[in-house]
Amino acid sequence: MDYSNKTVIVTGASNGIGQGVAVGFAEKGASVVLADLDEAAGVEAAASLQEKGWQAIFIKTDVRQESDIQQLMEKAAQSFGSIDILINNAGKAKFTPLHELEVEEWDDLLNTNLRSVFLCTKAASKYMKENEAGGAIINLASTRAMMSEPNSEAYAASKGGIVALTHALAASLSQERITVNAISPGWIETGDYARLRTEDHLQHFSRRVGRPQDIARACLYLTAEENDFVTGINLIIDGGMTRKMIYEE
């Protein structure tokens, strides 16, 4: 896969999965725009790519603000000439007991995780539809869109909304040659992988916990031009956990 003529925007790219995805595209030759609210970490992440000779810039962005998103798209297009791929990764996770969950917290989480996907896609697709090859959009959902634990109402609603929004967008943008897919990660360790316990790994069918690179490789597959027959799906990457029986032996 050659992405040397592609401009990729990754939101929430200062660390974790987003940073891993940014690295994955940069390695394949893409020009990468890292967007995040954390300016210090974002500048550092972009610099680490630039030091390797890769094309990368950081643009401070609050995905809750439509004006920030419009500015992100304008600067990205001005810097690299086009917008070809959007990775909607920005999000937050907070688990508050139901009877303590205030509407302000609910709104903030849904605005960050779900509304941002709508706003970023709406803004980016205006540029993508001008491309001869169209474009590709990936929305990061979660396995918590399909399964839950206590106190996850706001987070689950936001991620479930992303899955539904994804196939709606795939339908709406199909005439503009833009594919839209979701990825639902399971346990992706973004901290010290070496500190994980043996039982952490063995509870997965894959016999290991996931890494950001697992998500990056999926993004590369779903955004490759030759894979334009894949659109509207939710790709679950969880080492088999959502297919595992929960009953103890």
Regions found by a protein language model. Name each.
Residues 14-16:
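Conserved glycine-rich cofactor-binding loop
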Residues 87, 174, 179, 230-232:
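Short, small/polar-rich loop/turn modules that mediate ligand/substrate recognition or access, typified
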Residues 97-98, 105-110, 200-201:
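Substrate-binding pocket helix/loop in short-chain dehydrogenase/reductase
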Residues 121, 158, 166:
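Active-site helix of classical SDR
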Residues 126, 171-175, 228:
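Alpha-helical segment proximal to the catalytic Tyr-Lys
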Residues 142:
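Residue(s) in the substrate-gating loop at a strand-loop-helix junction
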Residues 147, 220, 231-249:
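Short C-terminal tail/terminal secondary-structure segment
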